[in-house]
């Protein structure tokens, strides 16, 4: 029969007196020394995880920065090719103007041998326009050069003053290996911040350069289509001159110089043509 343990005459049984007293503390049966070791391991585990995480993030950002710099270099090389293409198209246009002048002279020659030599000459070909210097390309080149010469930490200027731990916590770990780990974490965070600023500036410069090159592509397309139309028209003019004017010129030359051979006639025609240039 069970007895009330609060009775004055209650005596514990032999079995109950040998049972251990249950502990309700969070550390269970740990001693004070074991508890301190436990917290030390937890602190070091947390710091190590933070250190590893910032190291990985820093490497990823540095790699992204290198990719961005490489993209900038490729974009600048592409601009150089586009500029050369535009210059060539401008030179072709200038050549077509000279060709048109010669065609007009040929038309005048075949249309009338005695046309007034003092007739106003066709307009001189305009000078080849120069491709304007791009501000976006200059800025992008400067940014890419700075990042390439300085690496991922080109703009890193030391600790920013912001710390991951409070002053009291830093004082508690001063002189321990944890202080070195915390310092490395702070340095990684500062470098990550610098990488992010570099990427932000690089991204803005890349965007402006892409917009500028898109405008250049529109100009190139217009000039290519313009030159193609002019060349086609001049080809038709030349075919017309060769089809109708050549026979008239040949008849005139034969009537004036019946004894001339073909090469002499062609030479005479070329000299006559030069008079109207």
Curated annotation (Swiss-Prot):
One of its GO terms (molecular function) is SNAP receptor activity. It is found in: Synapse, Synaptosome. One of its GO terms (cellular component) is recycling endosome. One of its GO terms (biological process) is exocytosis. Residues 14-28, 134-170 have a biased composition (Polar residues). The keyword Repeat applies. Residues 1-30, 49-73, 117-170 are annotated as: Disordered. Disruption phenotype: RNAi-mediated knockdown results in the aberrant secretion and processing of the aspartic protease hrg-7 with accumulation of hrg-7 in its immature uncleaved form and in the intestine. InterPro entries: T_SNARE_dom (IPR000727). Residues 44-106, 179-241 form the t-SNARE coiled-coil homology domain. Residues 1-11, 49-65 have a biased composition (Basic and acidic residues). Keywords: Coiled coil, Protein transport, Repeat, Synapse, Synaptosome, Transport. The keyword Coiled coil applies. SNAREs, soluble N-ethylmaleimide-sensitive factor-attachment protein receptors, are essential proteins for fusion of cellular membranes. SNAREs localized on opposing membranes assemble to form a trans-SNARE complex, an extended, parallel four alpha-helical bundle that drives membrane fusion. Plays a role in the processing and secretion of the aspartic protease hrg-7 from the intestine. Belongs to the SNAP-25 family. This is Soluble NSF attachment protein 29. It comes from Caenorhabditis elegans.
């Amino acid at each position: 029969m069970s007895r009330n343990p609060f009775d004055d005459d209650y005596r514990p049984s032999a079995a109950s007196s040998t049972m251990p007293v249950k502990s309700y503390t969070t550390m269970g049966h740990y001693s004070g020394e074991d508890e301190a070791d436990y917290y030390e391991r937890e602190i070091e585990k947390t710091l190590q995880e933070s250190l590893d995480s910032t190291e990985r993030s820093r490497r990823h950002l540095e790699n992204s920065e290198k990719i961005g710099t490489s993209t900038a270099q490729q974009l600048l090389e592409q601009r150089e090719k586009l500029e050369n293409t535009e210059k060539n198209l401008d030179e072709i246009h200038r050549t077509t103007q000279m060709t048109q002048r010669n065609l007009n002279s040929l038309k005048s020659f075949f249309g009338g041998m005695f046309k007034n030599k003092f007739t106003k000459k066709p307009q001189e070909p305009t000078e080849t326009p120069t491709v304007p210097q791009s501000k976006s390309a200059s800025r992008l080149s400067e940014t890419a050069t700075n990042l390439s010469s300085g690496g991922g930490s080109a703009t890193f200027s030391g600790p920013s003053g912001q710390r991951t731990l409070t002053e009291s916590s830093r004082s508690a770990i001063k002189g321990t290996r944890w202080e070195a780990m915390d310092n490395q974490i702070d340095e990684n965070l500062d470098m990550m911040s610098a990488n992010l600023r570099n990427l932000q500036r690089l991204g803005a410069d890349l965007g402006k350069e892409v917009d500028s090159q898109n405008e250049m592509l529109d100009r190139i397309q217009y000039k290519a289509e313009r030159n193609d139309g002019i060349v086609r028209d001049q080809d038709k003019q030349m075919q017309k001159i060769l089809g109708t004017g050549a026979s008239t010129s040949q008849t005139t030359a034969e009537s004036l110089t019946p004894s001339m051979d073909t090469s002499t006639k062609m030479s005479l025609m070329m000299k006559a043509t030069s008079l109207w240039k």
